[in-house]
From Swiss-Prot:
The keyword Nucleotide-binding does not apply. InterPro entries: Asp/Glu/hydantoin_racemase, Asp/Glu_race, Asp/Glu_racemase_AS_1, Asp/Glu_racemase_AS_2, Glu_race. This is Glutamate racemase. HAMAP family: Glu_racemase (MF_00258). Its EC number is 5.1.1.3. Belongs to the aspartate/glutamate racemases family.
Length: 265
């Protein structure tokens, strides 16, 4: 039987991680879930983050025989991993900003993340541990997350707006850590604003290697074509556009998981 891999994010940015994992583990069954009712996670309290992610992930683990959970959200990963690892008996992998590899190639680093991620002590500990001699500039933006989501459903990125967000970094950084899984979908536009020579680094490939290591051998026939399942936490007006995106990635049509509690921000 193929392995069942659950990938979770607040939105569809986690598809950047899915693509890296599928490249290394093509013969697996993928379940992708996103909490669109709670989006964006960078604006939620830690208690609400833990409550929402725990409920949704446990529900899907009961529905599918999940072998490993990937929290494809930097904001959630800095908060929910200890709780999930207590609740579940299977491996739970999170994503963290790729500060360490960035520090190996540059001393003028920019960390681009959500407002929540750049404020967390975990992020400052990473910088202290792996980039203490580097000049690390921090920029947190919820709007960039929204722009990535919009791009994925066919809305062009507004380069004037993007330039306004990133302009303080022009000529100041030569390596940018994409500290949110949504941001790899904005690679082209970020380079248009900051220059083609700026190096962009994310955690996707490293996460994929870790998942492959934890899963071990994947028992599936090469001739098998496995369609993935995708869930959202609430109905969405973008369902048609999202289904087109997911179909191109070999997922079945979007299903609404439902979340019983209203979101109190």
């Amino acid at each position: 039987m193929p392995k069942n891999i659950l990938i979770f994010d607040s939105g569809i940015g986690g598809l950047s991680v899915f693509k890296d994992i599928r490249y290394q583990i093509p013969l697996a069954k993928y379940i992708y879930a996103f909490d669109n009712a709670g989006f964006p996670y960078g604006e939620l309290t830690e208690d609400i983050l833990i409550e929402r992610t725990s409920y949704i992930i446990q529900k899907l683990c009961h529905r599918h025989k999940i072998d490993i959970v990937v929290i494809a959200c930097n904001t959630a990963s800095t908060v929910v991993l200890p709780t999930l690892r207590t609740l579940l008996s299977i491996p739970v992998v999170g994503v963290v900003p790729a500060i360490k590899p960035a520090a190996l190639v540059s001393q003028k680093i920019g960390l681009l993340a959500t407002p929540a991620t750049i404020k967390r002590s975990y992020t400052f500990d990473l910088i202290k541990s792996f980039a203490s001699i580097s000049d690390v500039k921090l920029l947190g933006s919820t709007r960039l997350v929204e722009m990535a989501e919009e791009k994925m459903v066919g809305i062009p990125v507004n380069l004037i707006e993007l330039d306004e967000i990133l302009k303080s970094w022009k000529g100041q950084v030569d390596c940018i850590v994409l500290g949110c899984t949504h941001f790899p979908f904005l690679r082209k536009e970020i380079k248009e604003i900051l220059g083609r020579n700026v190096l962009l680094i994310d955690s996707g490939e490293a996460i994929a290697r870790r998942v492959k290591q934890l899963l071990g051998s994947v028992d599936a026939n090469k001739g098998d074509h496995l369609f993935g399942e995708v869930y959202c936490s609430a109905s969405t007006k973008n369902e048609e556009a999202l289904n087109k995106t997911f179909k191109e990635l070999d997922f079945n049509p979007l299903q609404t998981l439902g979340y019983p509690k209203s979101l109190d921000r």
